[in-house]
Design a protein with these regions (language model features):
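Extracytoplasmic beta-rich repeat domains
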Residues: 19-28, 50-75, 100-117, 140-157, ...
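Blade/loop signatures of beta-propeller domains
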Residues: 30-59, 225
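Structural signature of WD-repeat beta-propellers
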Residues: 85-86, 125-126, 165-166, 210-211, ...
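Sec-dependent N-terminal signal peptides
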Residues: 4-12
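Short loop/turn segments that connect beta-strands within beta-propeller blades
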Residues: 94-97, 134-138, 174-178, 220-223, ...
Length: 342
């Protein structure tokens, strides 16, 4: 303690001495230390509360969902919520009461997924595996080593899941045996934002968004490419400018595929032939939400926007929460729910 105090006295004395020779001079690290922090987002705006929010339940679980170095997220199926943590566990909680139904020790570093059906649970690990575990007795039914990290897993469709890996491959896997049914690949981009949108299945086709803004429609049975289209980058001056990942959730509604890319576009595409119906230059790393007539998304500036599904015309925007809003919006009962950075 004496050494520290002595250092401070000498330091302050030195500053005082410097002031005599250089009037008005104060070292930068002194001014910056006492300078009020400037936040990169606006303050919370004033608003009139006209909706009551009631907490139904709260549950404290061991571990945490740490998605800084993974793509962990909760998954809901029926009245169950599957919660992966950084302690290799997956907790199953009642969505009605918050009661902990069971905890499954996977023995692996859960990295991505989680997908579940009535019987099995599927997830990707940091060990580059995809695993199917029986929910009733926690038994591993099958496990396959993939060519790279598992970035996303589709919902189960006709006893098949479709897995996207970090090397831009998509693999169809039989959920009963773990057998690879087919594998198809794209040329990986030289630079990308680490992430991947979840494959979606509709009418015997699988739709996947890749890191170069490319959307590919595959035949779900054979893996053959039916069509592909690319959402162009807004800017192309540098490699960073050309980042154009499709990492957020895509939507299919009435035969139209809606997708959005980072530094690229929001587009409506005919899911049958890949024809672009309309396109807007926007940028978002998050996914889309919808109701009957509109598409909702959050721009990179944290501005919530609503556009017409059929024309692509912007109907409204909410910019009072500039850079505060994060994540994919959720449409529920004529409300749009969005996370705040604080």
């Amino acid at each position: 303690m004496k050494k520290i105090l002595f250092f401070l006295i000498i330091f302050l004395s030195s500053c005082s001495t410097t002031e005599r020779f250089l009037p008005g001079f104060t070292p930068d690290f002194i001014t910056k230390y006492f300078k009020e922090e400037v936040k990169p987002y606006v303050g919370l705006p004033d608003f009139v509360k006209n909706t009551d929010v009631i907490k139904v339940w709260e549950k404290k679980l061991p571990g945490e969902i740490n998605n800084e170095y993974s793509f962990l997220s909760m998954y809901k199926l029926g009245d169950r919520i599957f919660i992966p943590t950084d302690e290799n566990n997956i907790h199953i909680v009642s969505s009605e009461t918050g009661e902990l139904k069971k905890t499954i020790d996977t023995g692996l570093d859960v990295f991505s997924g989680i997908i579940a059906d009535s019987d099995l649970l599927y997830f990707g690990s940091k060990q580059d595996t995809i695993t199917a575990i029986k929910q009733s007795d926690h038994k591993v039914i099958w496990q396959r080593l993939m060519s790279s990290e598992v970035m996303s897993i589709s919902e189960v469709a006709n006893d098949v899941i479709y897995v996207v890996t970090n090397d831009s491959k998509i693999t169809a896997i039989d959920i009963n045996t773990g057998k690879f049914l087919w594998i198809n690949s794209q040329i990986p981009s030289s630079l990308s934002i680490r992430g991947s949108s979840k494959p979606i299945i509709s009418d015997d086709k699988v739709y996947v968004g890749f890191e170069d803004g490319r959307i590919v429609s595959y035949d779900s049975l054979s893996g053959d490419i039916i069509w592909q289209n690319q959402l162009k980058s807004i800017r192309i001056e540098t490699v960073i400018d050309r980042l154009n990942d499709i990492d957020g959730a895509m939507i299919i509604d009435n035969g139209i595929l809606y997708a959005i890319s980072y530094q690229g576009s929001l587009a409506a595409i005919d899911s049958f032939n890949g024809q672009v119906l309309w396109i807007n230059e926007v940028s978002s790393i998050d996914g889309l939400a919808e109701n009957d007539d509109n598409i909702f998304f959050l721009s990179d500036e944290g501005i919530l926007k609503g556009v017409d599904k059929y024309t692509g015309k912007q109907k409204w925007k909410q910019d009072q929460f500039f850079k505060r809003l994060i994540g994919t919006p959720v449409y529920y009962n004529d409300f749009i729910l969005v996370s705040d950075i604080e």
